[in-house]
Amino acid sequence: MKDVGKSIYHPILVLVYTRNEGFQSRAAVVASKAIGNAVTRNKVKRRLKSCLDQFWQNVDQQWDLIFYSRAAIVDANITEICSAIEHLLLEAGVLGEKK
């Protein structure tokens, strides 16, 4: 997906997205070992998933989304993470009308 998708960069996240052939959108969250130990990576992934849930109903169908965490996300609070996700989704144009 990284080869065929488009990327958008933010200081704490990278979004790679592309259209899929199915009827549903899918999302994945990636936190590499560069983020920290397992506890830190899991904490980051939980925060990302929590924020993504707020916007998921508004994501148009047929998108594949991958959110890659950057090292700066460890110091970010939940509000900054949610703001970053919203910014990336809007810039990618994958958000539809609010439901």
Please annotate each region the language model reported.
Residues M1-K99:
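Positively charged, solvent-exposed patches that mediate nucleic-acid binding
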